[in-house]
């Protein structure tokens, strides 16, 4: 349903954000 789609999108967005922050601080 819509709820699971939003949850899935949110999870992937958080993963992308965490990855971006990790790369930012690694440099």
UniProtKB/Swiss-Prot annotation:
Tissues and organs where the protein is expressed, per its UniProt entry = Expressed by the skin glands.
> Per its database record, what is this protein's job?
Has antimicrobial activity, but no hemolytic activity. Preference on killing Gram-negative non-enteric bacteria.
Question: Membrane-crossing residues?
Answer: none
State the name under which the record lists this protein.
Bombinin-like peptide 2
Matches recorded under Pfam families: Bombinin
Q: What is its main location?
A: secreted
Superkingdom of this entry's organism? Eukaryota
């Amino acid at each position: 349903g819509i709820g699971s789609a939003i949850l899935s999108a949110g999870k992937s967005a958080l993963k992308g954000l965490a990855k971006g922050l990790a790369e930012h601080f690694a440099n």
